[in-house]
Swiss-Prot record:
The keyword Nucleotide-binding does not apply. It comes from Drosophila melanogaster (Fruit fly). The gene is Mau2. GO terms for biological process: axon guidance; cell division; chromosome segregation; maintenance of mitotic sister chromatid cohesion. Interacts with Nipped-B to form the cohesin loading complex. PANTHER family: MAU2 CHROMATID COHESION FACTOR HOMOLOG (PTHR21394). This is MAU2 chromatid cohesion factor homolog.
Amino acid sequence: MSASTSTSTAASQDACYISLLGLAEYFRTSQPPNIKKCIQCLQALFTFMPPSKVEARTHLQMGQILMAYTKNIDLARQHLEKAWSISEPLPNFDVKFDTASLLAQLHLQTDRNSHQAKAMLRRAVELSQNNVYWHCKLLLQLAQIHASDREYSLASELLAVGAESADEASATYLKVLFLLSRAMILMIERKTNDVLALLNSAGQIIDNNIPNPHQKEYLKVFFLVLQVCYYLALGQVKTVKPSLKQLQMSIQTIMAPNWPSDEAIFGANQLEMFVWLPKEQLYVLVYLVTVSHSMMAGYMDKAQKYTEKALTQIEKLKQQEDKPILSVFKVILLEHIVMCRMVMGNRELAIREIAAARDVCMAAPQRSLLRRHSAQLHCLIGLYSMSTNLFEHAERQFVVCVSETSERDLKLFANLNLAIIYLRTKRDTDLKQILDAVSTENTHTYSSQALMGGFYYVQGLHAFHKNSFHEAKRFLRETLKMANAEDLNRLTSCSLVLLSHVFLSIGNSKESMNMVTPAMQLASKIPDIHVQLWGSAILKDLHRMSKDVQHEKDAYANHVKYSENLIADQRKCVQSAHHELVNWFQGDPPVTSGPPAAPVLLMPESSVTASVPVIASTSTAMQPAGQYGQFY
């Protein structure tokens, strides 16, 4: 065959490839897409015996189409594996990286474990060292899988490598993303000093070395979310306020109508095509941390208001595209609102919302959300069971929670509630055992100030029940010191009302009144019906002792009102179909039918807003402590 004939044949083949690819794209983008014909066009390419690179790219495209538009996962896998086997040995050919990334995603969807996905990505990371974009993208993807598997040290190491690679390529924006992602991992590992050092380092770079104002503001939101979460994890509700205010202002800036789209901000430079979360999801996340802050500070009305706004926003986003992260946000918000409802005495609403959280978890593919939130659901059902005086059910729920979770704060939270159950059911041996265990475990390790304040509160309650009033005062003053330092209003009101009861028990009516008055003021502000019920009983006794008949009558009337509200709510609870959840101790939670959770109220947009992916991706999470009956 002459050279001219060979050239002509090659040109003719190229024209066929281009025509078939163009036709395939035409069918893919038709309205509605004609995927069958699109696949037929791509399949036809193979009849021309294309060169290796064209063949590999076509197999990749077939895999992409099958994954995106069909349920034929096996055929998608075959095409992607073929693309990988052809492209892996070819130098300077990015198709291998795209294929590895997709194959890893497919393995995660279909395999029982993540071993194959990790192995695929590790090999791709090795091969991509001369391609900064793909090297960083694959490092992020692999780190995310390790983080999801709770292999935090491995995730942290990969992110450190990514930060170095970005630094060597002078990709400052990308370097900061790696630093902040690593800070998040270290936060989960409770390496607080390392977190602080990384946040300080990233903060300085954001302030001084990010020239693009839009990227700078975006990184600032990521940084401030982590800073707020850091303080909230420490229970530092007062300390966090300036950072939270800054975060709320930054998200307003990003959500303004004149703010450019994410594509415009991150699409110009390949090494800047990475985002942690799109701005619409960041908006929901800021609501979420605001809800968490309101809960810990003891502002239940605020927490409810922001939860309703956040849930409304989530539903809007779900209508556009139902991303898995939105379900994560929804579950966390429902977990918070359940605790609000119980503090306010709305337990029937609480069990409805626990059922709603269960439904969201059950709807997620492969029960992934249920695995991550099962312990929290058991804990919430334990709180609900306690509040309806089902102590045996509550105990079993908390024991399951402790056995299922590896989160130390959640374990401490459940154990403190177990201690209160043992106290109320007069199981002194079990109580001593759990208090000793909590004390030993938390003496030399970091814990939330709110939870440690709660621990002192439980010890004060224990001393009160033993009639060791001096010891009770000592513990409760320690609790008050911690609560007042960080504006933990609910812990303050609970401690004050118990301290008032201590003084009443030793006949010091003046000090008792000095304690119960601010306790009731705080309780009405929260509002906390349990503290109000307790405080009104103390006030009734104090007014009777001082022969103040009118005030005694008023206190008694209030006590009856709070009591009747709780009794009426209790009646609704036991009649609810969702009440059956108290009997769920293992496996999947039972399906219960009943009234849905309270409807989300459509409110005007707020001027301030309120387990997210741990790692940034390419542009294509706190229990407050409390009261006599239980901790919420």
